[in-house]
């Protein structure tokens, strides 16, 4: 929903923003970064991740400086876009710079079986499926869509039984014999564990097909099937910088009462994070084999700190996003925005960790493209880990790429329908 601003107020706001930017005294770049960061914290009323001055363009720094001062700051209070992108703010708050969607409009081809959306490790507001995703899938695509909200910060061994209970409820409610699962982040591992012969069926001592026969397909989005180094660092298993700082950054991202004490002392949190480590992934994948009769497919997300382009990164992106049938896998990228997704500021501290210090490695801030592949790889979407769920504070269409996440989900379901699922 776009905020309504009187034209005269808009003129005054823009005049103040331009005037403040033009009159700013010369200062060292590092000092300016620190000042802008402090202003953003005060303006938005919530902490922003630290700005990487070396990776922030002068133009973006100018925009952030302008948006954190005077009347513009007042307009941002309480409604600032969660990604920190000045272009997103201009579109959502002022109606300036908005772009048309390049994501194809969904066809109204309902799936044969209901679609169940499965959440990731967290259920805080930033990590919930946007209501617009559900409404677009239902209204534009004609799909029956329901949610499976699993306990946050638990392992697949705990969450898969919850998912099975929800599937049984949906089957009873709809009369459908099977469901299609679309699973984000850790939810992808839960979905795989649910139907694997060595997963929930083995835990309960029942026939492997008991759970698998109730699931028609598993589509994972942004799932770290081969682990994410962010989890290794949070658990102190990888020597990347200051462990305490990384934990605090994750607390800012999750919006939860995180602390070094909680991660060190809460066995549930540690177990959930351990499932996502690079160290634990090989054993999980070797044990949790795919179930017969279930379609497995995956999508990866990618984004760039401050939307910055890089020839080395883009070359890797083109290579890694190639789909199983040899297509580019980047169909959602070329469009009106002409650039990369602006990674949410809260994710920026983790992008370098996820990529093991290699800036050319494509990731969504938490999961690399390579780690997100499982089953039939469908390609990459220009969305960071949070934007893959939609964010109520962002424009419906990404201003830099033209990507529409709600249409994307509706099209994923439409593709399942075309496969008879």
What is each stretch, according to the model?
Residues 12, 16-17, 342:
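Residue-level detector of intrinsically disordered terminal segments
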């Amino acid at each position: 929903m776009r905020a309504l601003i009187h034209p005269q107020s808009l003129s005054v706001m823009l005049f103040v923003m331009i005037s403040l930017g033009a009159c700013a005294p010369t200062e060292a770049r590092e000092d300016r970064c620190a000042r802008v960061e402090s202003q953003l914290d005060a303006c938005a009323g919530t902490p922003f991740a630290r700005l990487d001055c070396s990776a922030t363009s002068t133009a973006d720094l100018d925009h952030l400086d302008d948006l954190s001062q005077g009347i513009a700051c007042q307009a941002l209070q309480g409604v600032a876009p969660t990604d920190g992108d000045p272009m997103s703010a201009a579109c959502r708050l002022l109606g300036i710079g908005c772009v048309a969607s390049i994501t194809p409009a969904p066809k109204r081809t309902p799936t044969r079986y209901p679609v169940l959306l499965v959440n990731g490790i967290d259920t805080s507001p930033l990590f919930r499926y946007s209501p617009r995703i559900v409404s677009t899938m239902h209204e534009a695509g004609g799909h029956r869509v329901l949610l499976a909200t699993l306990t946050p910060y638990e392992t697949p061994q705990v969450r898969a039984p919850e998912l099975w209970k929800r599937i049984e409820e949906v089957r009873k409610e709809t009369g459908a014999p099977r469901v299609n699962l679309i699973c984000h982040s850790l939810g992808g591992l839960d979905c795989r564990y649910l139907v694997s012969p060595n997963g929930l069926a083995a835990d309960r001592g029942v026939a492997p097909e008991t759970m698998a026969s109730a699931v028609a397909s598993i589509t994972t989005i942004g799932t770290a099937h081969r682990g994410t180094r962010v989890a290794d660092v949070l658990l102190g298993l990888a020597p990347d910088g200051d462990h305490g700082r990384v934990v605090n950054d994750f607390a800012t991202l999750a919006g939860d009462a995180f602390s070094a004490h909680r991660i060190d002392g809460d066995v549930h949190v540690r177990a959930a994070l351990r499932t996502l480590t690079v160290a634990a992934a090989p054993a999980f994948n070797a044990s949790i084999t795919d179930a017969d009769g279930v379609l497995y497919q995956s999508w990866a997300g990618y984004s760039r700190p401050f939307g910055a382009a890089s020839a080395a990164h883009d070359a890797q992106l083109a290579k890694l996003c190639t789909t199983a049938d040899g297509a580019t896998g980047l169909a959602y990228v070329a469009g009106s925005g002409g650039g990369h997704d602006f990674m949410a500021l809260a994710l920026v501290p983790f992008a370098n960790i996820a990529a093991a210090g290699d800036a050319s490695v494509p990731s969504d801030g938490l999961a690399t493209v390579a780690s997100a592949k499982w089953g039939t790889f469908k390609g990459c979407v220009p969305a960071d880990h949070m934007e893959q769920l939609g964010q109520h504070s962002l424009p419906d269409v990404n201003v830099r790429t033209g990507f529409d996440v709600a249409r994307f989900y509706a099209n994923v379901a439409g593709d399942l329908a075309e496969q008879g699922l």
